[in-house]
Amino acid sequence: MIERKALIFNIQKYNMYDGPGVRTLVFFKGCPLRCKWCSNPEGQLRQYQVLYKENLCVHCGACVPVCPAGVHTISASTLRHGFAEGAQCIGCRRCEDVCPSSALAVVGEQKTISELLEVIEEDRPFYETSGGGVTLGGGEVLMQPEAAVNLLAACKQHGINTAIETCGYAKQEVVMKAAQYVDLFLYDVKHIDSARHYELTGVRNELILSNLTWLLENKHNVKIRVPLLRGVNDSEDDLRGLVEYLRPYQDYKNFKGIDLLPYHKMGVGKYKQLGWEYPIEGNPALSDADLERVEACIRKYDFPVSVIRH
């Protein structure tokens, strides 16, 4: 029997922000949204990609002849890495191997459920002493539903606490199947207004809110996460719309409150490495005073709220 594989782009250990206790984060590649502030753009496409660090490149051209896909090209003494029109990286990593200056990195790796579970199990002592476990994120983990559900089920069979970070944009049957094996959903609500949500992410939010309602009404543990940007979703009206939507579930034991995730620029450099333009102009980061205002606004409606600073 061939074991299901997942396309992963990172595994992060000793995380303290994305679920209770010390956690291992497994990042699944591929996402149906295109959030303008995305800090993991290398997780958006469900395919191999090349990150090119121009400042490290010595322009030796060693990557060009070893690439079977023609991703690396040279013409008129100009090297181009990973951006060749019509070429797609196949994940062979030969360019990585021959690059003398570590200027190239292939993003994406196929891992079996057994391989992932082995990595997750390495930190069991930390989970047991801290109440931690594993969190699956991305990208969007539910874009690889079979692999995600198989890994979640395997973790539960091994007594490991499970959480997923999700944008909620998935078929409801996928959410229902995953929910059997999830101890906590870290559920993004990027904007409560569907038209505005479309402008910011490329999709409307009706499916997202429908899945959220199903999870809350069926007693699955949910913590709402709001990526917070100044002038985008931090107004009194924006926040009131969010809490009014959540008000029917305010006293549910499975509703675990609201996390605010302030905008940051930690992923900006990766856009250039992918050959992409950064979608946001200006700086929508909130000041400490802005964050205090937003917190106070939510608290006045008697909702538990925390600011998560990465």
UniProtKB/Swiss-Prot annotation:
EC nos: 1.97.1.-
Top-level class of the enzyme under EC nomenclature: oxidoreductase
Keywords associated with the record: 4Fe-4S, Iron, Iron-sulfur, Metal-binding, Oxidoreductase, Repeat, S-adenosyl-L-methionine
Binding site for [4Fe-4S] cluster 1: C31, C35, C38
Classification via Pfam families: Fer4_12, Fer4_9, Radical_SAM
InterPro entries noted in UniProt: 4Fe4S_Fe-S-bd, 4Fe4S_Fe_S_CS, Aldolase_TIM, BssD/PflA/YjjW, CutC_activ_rSAM, Organic_radical-activating, Organic_radical_activase, Radical_activat_CS
Annotated positions binding S-adenosyl-L-methionine: W37, C38, S39, G139, D188, V189, K190, H264
Family: Belongs to the organic radical-activating enzymes family.
UniProt function note: Catalyzes activation of the choline trimethylamine-lyase CutC under anaerobic conditions by generation of an organic free radical on a glycine residue, via a homolytic cleavage of S-adenosyl-L-methionine (SAM). Is involved in the anaerobic choline utilization pathway that allows D.alaskensis to grow on choline as a source of carbon and energy.
Subunit field text: Monomer.
Protein name according to UniProt: Choline trimethylamine-lyase activating enzyme
